[in-house]
């Protein structure tokens, strides 16, 4: 049985103003060994260290956030374009229709993938806030998370409608519909936020050391418990753990698709596709990857899997990814 915790109980502490959420040392990917098997598919040069990536369906482009900035990489053989931004982004999300949003200190950037133009959006009253995560709800509203553990739901491009501050740090945000979901690595927890953004709905412990979070089109949440060696699958209405499956070799990178959940194994430079439809993950396919395969993205229209190296070893493109 999985215990459900309502985060409003946090407010019942004797001194809530001074309370700091208890934390553990955050987990992270394994330091990958040198590649000994040729990566599947094609490897495109990308000397920067990839941090996050998203595929934009409208422009058929992969947008990669690297240690040195932002790169737009068209599908096929199109030349990549580097995009200049005024300050270092921390995370990104997209709408699938040609816009990508990148969190940064004091606000976020809106990138037009077609033109490469960048607009800077300053969140009112939060010029000094270190925003660490960003997601977009189905109603178009953006949600931002911060290094000091707050979640901000915007009512316009720059205005905050509501906020809640109960986390050690907001390490990742995703959405299912108008529900935002927070991953806090220090608390190794996942938490759903009320649609109005003013409070938490439910929270669950996520293994022994959760590191990454993804959402899929079937309404599921995928979590890599890297320290515990597991793939965790949650439902969101209400938040409930549906599946927990052992995955060895430091699972880290995640992307959910219509048919498979893809997980990268950073200790062995492998990516594995799991079918979740039966109620327990079933491995369907695995591919050798580039070194340090920390970042995954997927093009559903062409079944193309992208594996981006965070050690500067390129971006791997696997066409028609999946079981044969």
Where do the PLM segments sit?
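Sec-dependent N-terminal signal peptides
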Residues: 1-5
């Amino acid at each position: 049985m999985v215990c459900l915790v309502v985060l409003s109980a946090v407010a019942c502490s004797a001194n809530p103003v001074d309370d700091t959420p208890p934390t553990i040392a955050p987990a992270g990917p394994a330091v990958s060994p040198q590649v000994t098997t040729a990566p599947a598919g094609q490897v495109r040069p990308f000397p920067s260290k990839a941090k996050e990536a998203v595929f934009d369906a409208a422009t058929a482009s992969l947008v990669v956030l690297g240690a040195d900035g932002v790169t737009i990489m068209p599908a096929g053989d199109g030349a990549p374009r580097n995009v200049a931004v005024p300050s270092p982004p921390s995370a990104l999300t997209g709408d699938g229709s040609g816009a990508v949003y990148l969190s940064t200190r004091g606000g976020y950037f809106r990138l037009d993938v077609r033109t490469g133009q960048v607009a800077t959006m300053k969140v009112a009253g939060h010029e000094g806030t270190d925003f660490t995560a960003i997601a977009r709800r189905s109603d178009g509203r953006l949600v931002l998370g911060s290094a000091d553990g707050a979640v901000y739901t915007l009512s316009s491009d720059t205005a905050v409608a509501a906020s809640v501050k109960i986390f050690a740090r907001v390490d990742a945000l995703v959405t299912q519909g108008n529900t935002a979901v927070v991953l806090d690595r220090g608390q190794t927890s996942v938490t759903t936020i009320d649609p109005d953004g003013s409070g938490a709905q439910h929270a669950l412990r996520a293994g022994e050391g959760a590191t990454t979070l993804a959402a899929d089109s079937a309404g599921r949440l995928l979590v890599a418990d890297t320290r515990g060696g597991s793939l965790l699958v949650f439902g969101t209405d209400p938040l409930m753990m549906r599946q927990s499956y052992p995955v060895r070799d430091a699972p880290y990178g995640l992307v959910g698709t219509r048919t498979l959940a893809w997980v990268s194994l950073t200790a062995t430079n492998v990516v594995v596709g799991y079918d979740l439809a039966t109620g327990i993950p079933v491995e369907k396919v695995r591919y050798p990857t580039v070194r340090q395969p920390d970042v995954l993205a997927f093009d559903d229209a062409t079944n193309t899997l992208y594996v981006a190296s965070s050690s500067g070893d390129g971006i791997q493109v696997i066409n028609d990814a999946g079981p044969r």
